[in-house]
Amino acid sequence: MKQCTRQCILIIDFGSQYTQLLLRRIRELGIYAKVCDWNISQDLLVSLNPNGIIFSGGPDSVTNKHSSSISKVVFKIGVPILGICYGMQILVSQCGGNIRSVSNKGEFGYAQVEILSQKNTLIGNLYDYINDQGHCVLEVWMSHKDIVETMPQGFTVIGITENQQIAIIINEKCRWYGIQFHPEVTHTKKGKDILKRFAVDICRCEVTWKPVYIVKNIIKTIKKVVGQDRVVLAFSGGIDSLVTALLLKYAINHEQFVCVFVNNGLLCCNEINRISNFCKKYQDLNIIHLSEEKRFLSALTGVIDPEEKRKIIGKIFVEIFQAQISQLKNIKWLAQGTIYSDVIESGMSCASANIIKSHHNVGGFPSSVNIQLLEPIKDLFKDEVRNIGLYLGLPLNVVNQYPCPGPGMAIRILGEVREEYCNILRRVDYIFMEELNKSDLYNTVDQAFAVFLPVQSVGVQGDQRKYKWVIVLRAIETEDFMTAQWVRLPYTFLNKVSNRIVNEVEEVSRVVYDISCKPPATIEWE
C-alpha cells in the first residue's frame, strides 16, 4: 500500500471523552493530526505513515479480558508513542507490565505529580512549582481507577502522584512514553507544552498545518485525482460549500466545474442574499440556480417526524442532482463541503487516508449512476474552514456567518413544515440577527437561531386575548460544534429582542430562551 508522505500525528482512539480535544490541541500547534479507532488495520496504519502515535484515554480497564487493545504492529513501525491515561495502561500491559484495578484508590480531578528526574526528553525542565522538599511538581488533571503495579522492561518511572502511584513512565531507547494524566485539558497547566515536546521535539513534526500549506495541499490533491474530469458541486451557500467552491475554482479549469444551488423553500434568513453577493463577486463561477420550493414543501405536507423530514428532503435532493448530472453530461465527481465533525458523527473518522472516496451509490444515488464523491475539506474543523475562507479572500462577515443545517428550517420548525411557518420564522430570525449585530454580540456567539414551536400560547393585544405561536431563541458557544454551552446573553438584550418579535411579528405571542448545553441536548431541536 502506498504511504502518505504528509507530516502526521496519529491519535488512536480508545473511546475517551477528550479525544477530539486532544486532536485540536495537536492541530493548534500547527501540526496535522488524525484520529483512528483502536482496531486500525495494519494496511491503513502503514499507509498513514505517521511521525508519531498517541494512545488516547478511554473508559475501559485493561484488566478486563474484553477491553480494547492495540495491534503489536504499532510497536514495530519505529515511531514515538505517547500513551495517555488508559493509553499509558495499554502501553504498560502490552509491553509486559501489569495493571491492577483499585476502585477505592482511583485518582480523579486535580492532582500534583512529583517529577523524579529532569533528565528526559518528554518533560525535562517542565514543571509548575518546586515543593518544600525541593522537587519539581506538575499540576495535572486525572481520571483513572487502575494503577501500574509492575513496570515493563526498559521503562523508567519519572513521575509519581501524592498517593505514590506511577504517573509518568519513559522508555527513551524506544521513544515510548506514558502519562497517567490528561495533557489536552486546560487544568493540566503544562499540557500543551508536553504535547509540543512530543510532537515537535521527539516526533520531529514540521509546523505545516497552516492555511497556506493546507490550501496548497488540497489544490494539489484535487488536481491529481480529478484530472480532466468534470465536477458538480452541491452548493448550499454556507461557509463549507463556499470554501469548497473556491478551492475547486483554483484547482481545475472553469469548464470542468459546475455549482448547483437548490432553493428548497427552507433556507435560513439571508441565505439568498448571501449567495447572490457571492455570485456577483465570483462571476466566473458557473452556478446553476434551481427554484424547487413548491416541490419540497408539498412533499413535507403532513410530515411531523424529524427523521422522516430529513429523508424526504434528502431523497428530493438526490433526484434533483441525478437529473442535473444526466443533463450536464460527463460528470464524474460530486463535490460536497463535508467537514471533520460530519465525518466523526457519521462514525467514519478514519475510513480513508485520502480526501477521496469512490462510490457507485453515494447518498442514495441509484447504483446505475456512476459517480465518485469528492470531499476536499473533510479533514478540517469548522474554525479551520473559516480560517481557510479568510485566507482565500472571503469577507469576515461571510466567514463568521452562522451555519444553517442541511435540512434548513425543516428542523427548526417542530412538527409539520408549512410555508406560513417558514415565513414567520424568517421574520423572527431576521430580528434576532439584526439585534445581535446592532449590539456587537454577533461575533461573540458561534451559533444563534430561532425555533418555531407548533403550540399556541395566550397573549393580549389591545383589550383582546388571542392564542398565537411560541418562538424559542437559541445561542451557543463552541469550538467545534461537538460540544456546546448556551450563551448568557444580557437580559436587556433578550428583552429588546422579545419585545420586537411580539410587536413586529403578529403571529407570535410568546418568546422563550433555550438554556440547554450539548450534551445532553443537541444544538438543533430536531
Curated annotation (Swiss-Prot):
InterPro entries, alphabetically? Class_I_gatase-like, GATASE, GMP_synth_C, GMP_synth_GATase, GMP_synthase, GMPS_ATP_PPase_dom, NAD/GMP_synthase, Rossmann-like_a/b/a_fold
Q: What is its EC number?
A: 6.3.5.2
- The GMPS ATP-PPase domain covers which part of the protein? 209-401
Q: For this UniProt record, give its keywords in alphabetical order, as a comma-separated list.
A: ATP-binding, Glutamine amidotransferase, GMP biosynthesis, Ligase, Nucleotide-binding, Purine biosynthesis
Among CDD domains, the record links this protein to: GATase1_GMP_Synthase, GMP_synthase_C
**Keyword Nucleotide-binding included in the entry's annotation:** yes
Q: Which residues form the Glutamine amidotransferase type-1 domain?
A: 8-208
Q: Which GO terms describe its molecular function?
A: ATP binding; GMP synthase activity
**GO CC terms:** cytosol
Q: Where does ATP bind?
A: 236-242
Residues at the catalytic site: 85, 182, 184
Q: Which Pfam families match?
A: GATase (PF00117), GMP_synt_C (PF00958), NAD_synthase (PF02540)
Please write the reaction equations for the catalytic activity of this protein: XMP + L-glutamine + ATP + H2O = GMP + L-glutamate + AMP + diphosphate + 2 H(+)
Question: Superkingdom of this entry's organism?
Answer: Bacteria
Q: In which pathway does it act?
A: Purine metabolism; GMP biosynthesis; GMP from XMP (L-Gln route): step 1/1
Summarizing the function annotation, the protein's role is: Catalyzes the synthesis of GMP from XMP.
- Kindly state the subunit structure of this protein: Homodimer.
Q: What is this protein called?
A: GMP synthase [glutamine-hydrolyzing]
Organism lineage = Bacteria, Pseudomonadati, Pseudomonadota, Gammaproteobacteria, Enterobacterales
